[in-house]
Amino acid sequence: GVKEELPVVEAEKIKAKVSEIYSHNNFMQECGIYIVDMSCGSATVAVKVDPERHANLNGMAHGGLVATLADNATGIAGATIGKRVVTSTIATDFIKGAPVGTTISATSRITHADDRLVTINIEVRDLDNDTLVAKATAAMIVVDTFAGIPEKW
């Protein structure tokens, strides 16, 4: 079927609601992760790789930061379709390191969603060097819904 687009004003209200929900995510804030953009079924988050907080022993973004960035993008993507999700599994393929001082982003795209499970593909990129850092796939369990956020917009 043809997807009906909501008016831009409504889309902006949904984005603002999801952003407000995630402004209370203490772990995201502690890591310095912020939302860049979102649309129905997709989200992009980013973080500047801080040498004091995020570096591994090789002066690159720690793999835990890369995986955390991907994981946060999945939860936000779920919220864009009105679903409160928790991670069941996330498999991350690390491709290339991102040096400290660079900004990395994770973009998630929902590939399947029903009332119980959401599956998502994620790409993590080094924005300063235009390189692919990691690819991940996640299975998210739906634990609740977010009132006022439709599944399609």
List PLM regions with ranges.
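Residue-level recognition of well-ordered beta-strand positions that form the cores
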Residues: 46-48, 91-93, 107-109, 123, ...
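HotDog/MaoC-like acyl-thioester-processing domains
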Residues: 1-13, 98-100, 110-153
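Active-site-proximal helix-loop elements at catalytic-domain edges
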Residues: 13-36
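Alpha-helix initiation/capping motif
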Residues: 3, 7, 11, 20, ...
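A generic structural signal for short beta-strands and their flanking turns/coil linkers
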Residues: 29-31, 41-43, 86-90, 102-104, ...
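Hydrophobic beta-strand-centered segment that forms part of the acyl-chain substrate-binding groove
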Residues: 75-105, 110
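Compact, glycine-rich, soluble single-domain proteins
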Residues: 57-67, 71, 75
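Catalytic strand-loop segment that frames the active site of acyl-thioester-processing enzymes
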Residues: 30-60
